[in-house]
């Protein structure tokens, strides 16, 4: 809430002050359906200092209209900005569909003139022949999770967790693929453009991806400094 208020030009108190008041009132505890977040390690060997350097992607199941029926969400995230750079919903998992999505995302983001690392787990769509051929043509460096390490794709896992614990998540499933696509489109719009991400200093993924976060962070710093100067004993 402190960064959100700061972006409106308002400062009420620091994060520590809010937590102190919550503790005093016995209100500092985990809320919602999610489990408390767990710190995740990034993919081994690769770090990003800017957008379009390292992407990670995965597929998750979306519940269909009846038990045992699923739709499949293919989703790509830039680990520097946390922006969703590509997504599609399909009725099956294949390397061919994944390869087409990767190609579209690379062209849309203009990553053709720079080396790109693409991290994934070891599933068959991720390592299929079509996928490997597409990555070679696009000059993409492949990175895969370590064998027998189930949580080695942390950025995708965290994003799926955020997705499935949204308040409007349809617990009874999606009636059609079109319904699933519409919901994911709305989620991606909110996530990229409105969600203040804790891992990137509470700016939106879209702002960080475009480099617009710098001005926001400077404005916040000025606001906080002015607040401290007015109340030096806080």
What function would you assign to each model-found segment?
Residues 1-234:
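Charged DNA-binding/catalytic regions of mobile-element recombinases
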């Amino acid at each position: 809430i402190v960064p959100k208020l700061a972006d409106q030009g308002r400062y009420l108190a620091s994060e520590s002050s809010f937590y102190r008041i919550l503790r005093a009132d016995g209100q500092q505890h985990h809320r919602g359906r999610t489990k408390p977040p767990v710190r995740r390690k990034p993919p081994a060997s690769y770090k990003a200092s800017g957008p379009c350097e390292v992407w990670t992607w995965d597929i998750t199941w979306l519940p269909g209209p009846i038990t045992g029926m699923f739709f499949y969400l293919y989703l790509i995230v830039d680990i520097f900005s946390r922006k969703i750079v590509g997504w599609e919903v399909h009725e099956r998992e294949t390397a061919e569909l994944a390869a087409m999505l990767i190609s579209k995302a690379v062209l849309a983001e203009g990553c053709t003139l720079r080396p790109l690392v693409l991290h994934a787990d070891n599933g068959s769509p991720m390592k299929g022949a079509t996928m490997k051929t597409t990555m070679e043509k696009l000059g993409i460096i492949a990175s895969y999770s370590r064998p027998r390490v189930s949580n080695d794709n942390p950025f995708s896992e965290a994003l799926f967790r955020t997705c499935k614990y949204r308040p409007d998540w349809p617990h009874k499933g999606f009636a059609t693929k079109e319904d699933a696509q519409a919901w994911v489109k709305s989620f991606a719009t909110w996530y990229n453009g409105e969600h203040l991400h804790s891992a990137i200093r509470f700016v939106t993924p879209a702002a960080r991806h475009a480099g617009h976060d710098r001005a926001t962070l400077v404005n916040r710093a000025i606001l906080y400094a002015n607040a401290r100067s007015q109340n030096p004993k806080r």
